[in-house]
């Protein structure tokens, strides 16, 4: 039987003892393949900071197809893993912005919302500036879009922000916070504690 095209990675699902080792190997390979995302950092420094809590969160990022990698979006001394999948993580799409927006939908509610999913995973939604910084490292979201942190005034007016890359430029847009689309997910970050 052929494997499903979008089958979920089985890092932890099968309960294998070496799931953490598999994840570390995946992260190490990705780190080595994209040195331009983290100039001046070496893998040993990063790996030394990966405790059980960070690995559990990174596993969830990987399992939802975020392809986390270290990206220098907060300066050279802060190790931050960011979703670096070319398109918005497919395991985190079709979500409205927050719980208030989810509750406001009377019909056709999505499974959940961005802020609750990110919170349950222990990761943080990217800000618009962090999203723009990430886009200087590679080209992301050329076919999809990603929700970003929305300023309070915009959210109180019922809106929410999302970004994408089209025509070689990064754009920020607004939408009703209760909207959700199959091609819109969210990118997040995980700060790794200092050793």
Language model features by range: what are they?
Residues 2-124, 128-195:
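A binding-site-centric feature that preferentially detects glycan-recognition modules on secreted/surface proteins
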């Amino acid at each position: 039987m052929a494997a499903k095209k979008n089958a979920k990675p089985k890092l932890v699902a099968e309960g294998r003892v070496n799931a953490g080792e598999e994840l570390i190997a995946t992260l190490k390979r990705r780190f080595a393949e994209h040195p331009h995302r983290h100039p001046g950092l070496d893998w040993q420094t990063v790996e030394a900071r990966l405790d059980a809590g960070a690995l559990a969160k990174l596993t969830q990022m990987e399992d939802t197809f975020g392809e986390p990698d270290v990206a220098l979006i907060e300066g050279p001394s802060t190790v931050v893993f960011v979703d670096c999948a070319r398109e918005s993580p497919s395991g985190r799409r079709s979500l409205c912005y927050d719980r208030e927006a989810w509750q406001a939908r009377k019909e056709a509610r999505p499974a959940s919302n961005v802020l609750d999913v990110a919170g349950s995973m222990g990761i943080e939604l990217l800000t618009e500036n962090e999203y723009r910084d990430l886009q200087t490292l590679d080209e992301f979201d050329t076919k999809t879009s990603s929700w970003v942190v929305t300023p309070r005034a915009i959210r109180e007016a019922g809106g929410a922000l999302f970004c994408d890359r089209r025509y070689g430029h990064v754009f920020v847009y607004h939408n009703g916070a209760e909207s959700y689309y199959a091609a819109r997910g969210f990118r997040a970050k995980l700060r790794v504690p200092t050793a």
